[in-house]
Amino acid sequence: MGKIVISENVSLDGVVQDPTGEEGFRHGGWFGQVGDKDREEWAKVEFEEALGAEALLLGRRSDEYFGPRWTGRSGEWADRLNGLPKYVVSSTLVNPEWSNSTVLKGEVVNEVSKLKQEPRRGNRRLRQPSARAHTDEHDLVDELRLMVHPFVLGAGERLFGETSDKKSIRPPLRPDRR
């Protein structure tokens, strides 16, 4: 069975919106404000996650953001991401440009449930807030990995929006203590 892992960059107050500043959010661009050493550590963790993933599960916006940025790159990290199967949840996307992409047009929960049932030995990574909300609500996420950045933004799209009920987040059996 597949394992769904959410890997997300987040501010101290839970904001995930516009980390690069390209969306025009007034508090955007916070990701680029970390120091070089922190960015190097972040890159190491992201690279390790890419090596451990069996596929990427993205929403349309994430696919449209990451695809063009990785397609022309070379090197071990780029080769890994470009070679991975990608599942893009979208009701509007027809022909994704990023290699090895499959569009999942059905209802998010059903499509992700089907992916989880496929026998896999590794992880799938989920990166897209709107799709993530659906998977959180229906207990499809197996692991949550947060890269917390030292900023309080005070506004913006949060990692967890409103839910229908209080949610308990189960800690991993073996916490990662990097």
Where are the predicted features?
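Portal/gating segments that form or line small-molecule/metal binding sites
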Residues: 1-140, 150-178
